[in-house]
């Protein structure tokens, strides 16, 4: 878009701006009072999810105007372009085809003359062979012992997605197989890895090196340390050439879009899994990057995860905008950020299995839409992605809910919970106790969203209270209920947020599939590391950076 045709100049945007002037002082409690059936009109179901958007500060008229904005941005055509494999990642001139990773084997998707589905399922078949070999106790280390621990070495999308899903689906770990424990190490300082290396048996430890480019310094630093650890303990420090070869073959799997770099590093081609340049890192858990998930829950459950995401893909593609879950979720965010000036967003799962979901969404949303330049290179004169953070809701109640209830910031909240849990606990007494705990958790989830909406009016007594015991309410929130937390509903939940991000990016006219800010950080860090090591070139830096380096060098000289 040129400056004159940017979305904020559109009739739909201008109509929303005018409409917002009359909505800013409207309290949520009055919206429910003035229109019976408000909840039903702003609630939708799909793919095992119930999406309640009724606690946002909007009316039917608001949604009608937001849908007009989406159509003004050609959203329906954008959805087609995304799922058809057109080049929607404009800065890198390629498709963004994470949806292809969850297509069923009988599907066909021809992208630039090539059907990508067979390659996707060939990779899944290779993953399955590796998983079955581990679960049969047949993947053996250099000494012939079966692998018992798998450590995923990755960062960002190669870590957060697999970590989140593996934790969320821990209940689905297969019980009739050789047990393999899954671990994650991402920090470049080596602290996570160091803990594992003091506790694990090198003879039974397998490392998965996950890096799209296979140049990420965080991952390769950990990988080099892991390799040296194995060589020292299993191959006489690497001097035993025969054992060195066996160690490299049996203790490393590589996952990357760059097979030649995996081979250069020493990973056996038979133990390499590939993915493609058209899959962004933060969208990659659906393919080979998801190997730790498959090792944790088995391939059958991994395929159910894909099926749930694909169900949401079809919903996103085929459902009219006014009933489309990702579209409606995205429009609620657009309304809050761009028209009500709500620029903070908290993710609050009420289920301990979703402990890492907020961290996962931090990357998905802020790395995707934390942009200030349009696809045509114009500076955006409007806000884009809000600051997003979160924590398990029950814990957050004792951490930052004080700010939500009585602070000065307007914050949009997403409450997420499964409706049913613990149905399959065998012992009746234990099942009853756990179900009571789940009921308590659901009560807190619903109650907190109610208090954030109503403020003082949620309290049973209308007796006068001092100011420090007053609650203003009027904080917007979404409540997402899963029928159950299963591989299928989790897949749908993740895909829901992926598509929400795409909808917002389309309206803001930004590219959600690049991350040039991340690339700049890597470049500057590499240059700084060279100066730190050589003690030359500090004069090119700013005064603060030179001062900090001096502190480090003085400490090094003192030891």
UniProtKB/Swiss-Prot annotation:
Keywords: Cytoplasm, Gluconeogenesis, Glycolysis, Isomerase. It is found in: Cytoplasm. Its EC number is 5.3.1.9. The keyword Cytoplasm applies. Pathway: Carbohydrate biosynthesis; gluconeogenesis; Carbohydrate degradation; glycolysis; D-glyceraldehyde 3-phosphate and glycerone phosphate from D-glucose: step 2/4. HAMAP family: G6P_isomerase. This is Glucose-6-phosphate isomerase 2. It comes from Chromohalobacter salexigens (strain ATCC BAA-138 / DSM 3043 / CIP 106854 / NCIMB 13768 / 1H11). The gene is pgi2.
